[in-house]
């Protein structure tokens, strides 16, 4: 819903829809939004929606592939990529715009070894995607803490999250920031 509201002629940048539910794919396709695909179930829902709602066989639906690099909640694991990429290559309507993952503990140096393993695995997985698809795919893994602590892993872009609101995920950085607003949301998945 937010993506459609933002669109409406006012936002001209690409809009990624995180965690799309199955009822939203018709709206996503009609409004040229770009869904995050984090499982084969969600990919199949996308293909079904394309078959139902896309009338122009040349229309490109941009997607963003979430990779599981260690959180084990959402995302494709390395062993799932060959099947996913085969399906994507055989669907002329689908184009991968980006692949991404999320760092579980970038704000805490206790987890630095794990974070570095996540970054290394992400680099391997994103290379598999780019090599198989044979076209450039944007890559991003850094959150607010990662931007500060792991600048070498900036890849093509970063996702400034809570830092955007003047809240540091690393304690010593907080003294240099000011709160700029209030953040409210709904729980979309447990």
What are these model-derived regions, one by one?
Residues 15-25, 31-45:
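Catalytic beta/alpha-barrel core
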Residues 15, 60-62, 133-139:
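Short beta-strand/loop segments at the ligand-binding rim of alpha/beta enzyme cores
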Residues 26-29, 48-58:
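Short, charge-rich binding segments
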Residues 43-54, 69-190:
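Active-site loop/helix belt of alpha/beta enzymes
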Residues 1-16:
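Positively charged, low-complexity/disordered segments
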């Amino acid at each position: 819903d937010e993506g459609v509201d933002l669109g409406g002629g006012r936002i001209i940048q690409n809009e990624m829809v995180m965690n799309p539910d199955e009822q939203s794919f018709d709206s996503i396709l009609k409004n040229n939004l770009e869904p995050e695909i984090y499982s084969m179930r969600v990919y199949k829902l996308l293909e079904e929606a394309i078959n139902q709602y896309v009338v122009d066989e040349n229309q490109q639906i941009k997607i963003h592939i979430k990779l599981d690099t260690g959180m084990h909640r959402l995302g494709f694991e390395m062993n799932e990529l060959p099947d996913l990429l085969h399906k994507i290559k055989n669907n002329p309507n689908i184009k991968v715009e980006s692949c991404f993952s999320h760092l579980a503990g970038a704000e805490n140096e206790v987890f630095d070894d794990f974070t570095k393993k996540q970054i290394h695995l992400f680099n391997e997985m994103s290379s598999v995607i780019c090599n198989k698809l044979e076209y450039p795919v944007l890559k991003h893994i850094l959150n607010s803490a990662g931007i500060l602590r792991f600048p070498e892993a900036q890849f093509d872009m970063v996702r400034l999250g809570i830092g955007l609101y003047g809240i540091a995920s690393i304690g010593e950085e907080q003294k240099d920031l000011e709160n700029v607003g209030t953040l409210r949301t709904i729980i979309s998945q447990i």
